[in-house]
Amino acid sequence: MSNSAPAVEACTKIITFLAECEQEIGISEISRGTGINKNMVFRILNTLENEGWVYCNAQKYSLTLLLFGLVSKPLSRLSLNTIASPVLYDLLNKTGESTYLGILKEDKVLYLQHFDGVKNVRVAGRVGGEYDLYCSAPGKVLLAHAEKSFIEEYTSKALEKRTKNSITEKSALLQELENVRKNGYATDCEEFGNGITCAAAPIYDYSGKVIATVGCSAFTTNGECMEMIEKFLPYVLSAAKKISLILGAK
């Protein structure tokens, strides 16, 4: 037996549908788009209009700013650090490796949080530290989702080859960034430092914009890079999705 409330479920479907519409829309279109019969759509819209949630103009409906005001209140009380902390700890417990939260600061990735792995082996990284974008997994995530003009300017400058695996040639780096966007994550196999392996994923806000990155770092030896990444990448992706959902991402 289902514990769901059909009227509430229908209401949330209508609100979600209206939020995705770029213009005012009529009852017939809402009914087709949501799969809810017209009579139910009309009654729900009438209730939402009375409560100030939707606006009706010539029998076409749109959401009012009331909903956005309600949503912004809890978000304004939550900082990215507050939201991410328990998720990072969970990621640390599941992988045993160092975890971090980073944002773009000018042409670097800035670590807002960094927790050492349970093995007590300190991987490069500290809260407040700033690191290159092109040769680190979190950096590549942020660079890949930056403005096109910024990417062009950044990839056109001379980049230091920190290790033999660092990608410094423009065309190769642009292809790497394309792969990051396509795959939904970035990896770093000893590109930042010898023996250091990383995987990172983007964090999205309610508008679909990448605002941060979360990931894991570990020490690897004897060519274990990809094996290590395969081990903790699913947890990294799950952590990024969890934070994004709290921020209102779809």
Language-model features: where?
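Juxtadomain coupling helices with adjacent low-complexity linkers
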Residues: 170, 176, 194-195, 212-250
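Short, basic/aromatic recognition patches
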Residues: 83-91, 155-200, 241, 246
